[in-house]
Amino acid sequence: MARKNGKDGSGSASDKGGDKAAETKSQAGWRDHPPSFAGWARAAIAGSGTAPSLSPHLHPVLPPAAPGIVTVEPGRSVSLAAIDPDATGGLDKAEAKAALDAQRARIKHLQEMLYAERRHALLVVFQAIDTGGKDGTIRNVLEGVNPQGCRVWSFKVPSAEELDQDFLWRYHLRTPGRGLIGVFNRSHYEDVLVVRVKGLVPEETWRERYGLINDFERLLTLSGTVILKFFLHISKDEQKERLEARLADPEKHWKFDPADLVERKAWDAYQTAFDDALARCSTPYAPWHVVPANRKWARNVMVAKTIASSVSAMVLA
């Protein structure tokens, strides 16, 4: 039976002193190693009784990604250099607009069903190098979707408050509830990408984060959230053309940031970081999808098809 302290409790002075010492030690440990969502996720998964397999009633079986998209096989290495960023998945540019319109209509209708059922949530993650097309993809693919059921989050440099928490805190706060679609424009993967390339944290810190991210995503999955992760893959030459276009067109000047030129010098370092993140964090429950993104019209259709097919599986599960 648990010991009670206070007026009607027992517990000697020495017991209380021991409890106080233990409490102080525990508090010190929390300061040195503050609790995190990822740590809680690991404990929750261990006690869920569902590991290692997923609960079928919580996680629908999703169809393969659209043709042209390369899905990273869990446990396998990946090299972006070996993936053609100009691939179109057999799409014809002349038919792309009609194809995109059709997929957007599907997403709009299926999102309403997802919202009405409130059984699952969808989290769509977009990562890419600068000028990779995250904003354009989100804008073109999700045009017409009811904003009451879809929220886009663009993550910038962490605030002072966010830096006082564990690295996953700000992302978990913005994950979608059941019936909703959440979109991450950049995401928790920045904490194993830009922080690695820029040396913002020790190597041992960012290396440990791969496993913490997998635990975090597994927790979301076990809670009924389907995670679609898209990496928009462009070539170095394509990035150069897009940066030059931003400088040449006054209407695109707002997109240009001189820091982009500095980041471009770290192209190879970013490619290595991308390869590692894609390989280490592509799991059976949240695989990475590499989207050839040099051709924007093909990119949009491939992403739209994959989202539409996934939401269809969710509402029919």
Predicted regions and their residues:
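Asparagine/serine/threonine-enriched low-complexity, disordered tracts
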Residues: 4-12, 16-24
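NTP-dependent small-molecule kinase module
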Residues: 4-7, 272-317
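Pre-Walker A adenine-sensing motif
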Residues: 108-115
